[in-house]
Amino acid sequence: MAQEVDTAQGAEMRRGAGAARGRASWCWALALLWLAVVPGWSRVSGIPSRRHWPVPYKRFDFRPKPDPYCQAKYTFCPTGSPIPVMEGDDDIEVFRLQAPVWEFKYGDLLGHLKIMHDAIGFRSTLTGKNYTMEWYELFQLGNCTFPHLRPEMDAPFWCNQGAACFFEGIDDVHWKENGTLVQVATISGNMFNQMAKWVKQDNETGIYYETWNVKASPEKGAETWFDSYDCSKFVLRTFNKLAEFGAEFKNIETNYTRIFLYSGEPTYLGNETSVFGPTGNKTLGLAIKRFYYPFKPHLPTKEFLLSLLQIFDAVIVHKQFYLFYNFEYWFLPMKFPFIKITYEEIPLPIRNKTLSGL
């Protein structure tokens, strides 16, 4: 689809048929957990703040072709295939799949921190065939979270796309060994076919990955500034859509990983043209690039450790963060506890009884 589900091209290392995990080098992972910011610019004055929160995730009319500069370390969706059309009277078992991020490389290491990747499994009772469906980054997690600073370009260069991947088979051992493989519902073939049409539309219009959830504080009911758009959100959207079609889910606990930044009210800075264009704010543009500099990939160990110190100093001491969301830049005045990884329960949806005959 979007060349991903429909044509089966793809990117990621798997165990067996396995599923995709957050894919970046260990250095990117550490940097992600430490956050990023380099001092050098404070909040812009005179630019009006947007008052409608959270900022809606922007959808697009079509998925653009990736720039050749963007290269994946692990091929996206290498065993992918088109979503099949099911017989209307087929009973399709639906499974919740969850395993530690980077499990293919680090085993259960990140599972102990509850940093998990989510996917969905299906089994046709008529054919006995199993399928896996997931949504993840085309060019690994680091590229979706931080840009490249190319010397020939004034603006940071982003290799950020996420997409759905569908392939035959479920790697039972992978999901069961360190994670979860549990049936959550049974749907009809008609519901599955309806879902397949929705997945294609969702995949063609929701094109970029967003790592961060940004809130005012960890307190319940605190203002949410920005929502993430990642593998777990795809699973949640799909489950909700199946419930709209009439699927009835089991009453079991389902938890998901979320990475939070905490800040005061964000300040809107502008898009690439208004910040980095011919009439842009050169001081602001330089500050943003300095902010992202510690996240350069493939740093030598000594330089990488120095970058971590810069990150710690910036986010803890200077309380600054620049967020790129909807292809626009925002300034976040960071607040304690700055960053937090949670493993929160989000209940399975309730069936729409008016559509249960599908």
Curated annotation (Swiss-Prot):
Glycans are attached at N130, N143, N178, N203, N255, N271, N281, N352. N-glycosylated with both high mannose and complex type sugars. Glycosylation is important for proper folding and trafficking to the lysosomes. Can undergo proteolytic cleavage at the C-terminus, probably by a cysteine protease and may involve the removal of approximately 10-15 residues from the C-terminal end. It catalyses: S-hexadecanoyl-L-cysteinyl-[protein] + H2O = L-cysteinyl-[protein] + hexadecanoate + H(+). Its EC number is 2.3.1.-, 3.1.2.22. InterPro entries: CLN5. Residues 1-23 are cytoplasmic. Disulfide bonds join C70-C159, C77-C165. Changing R63P: In CLN5; Retained in the endoplasmic reticulum rather than reaching the lysosome. Thermostable. Belongs to the CLN5 family. This is Bis(monoacylglycero)phosphate synthase CLN5. The gene is CLN5.
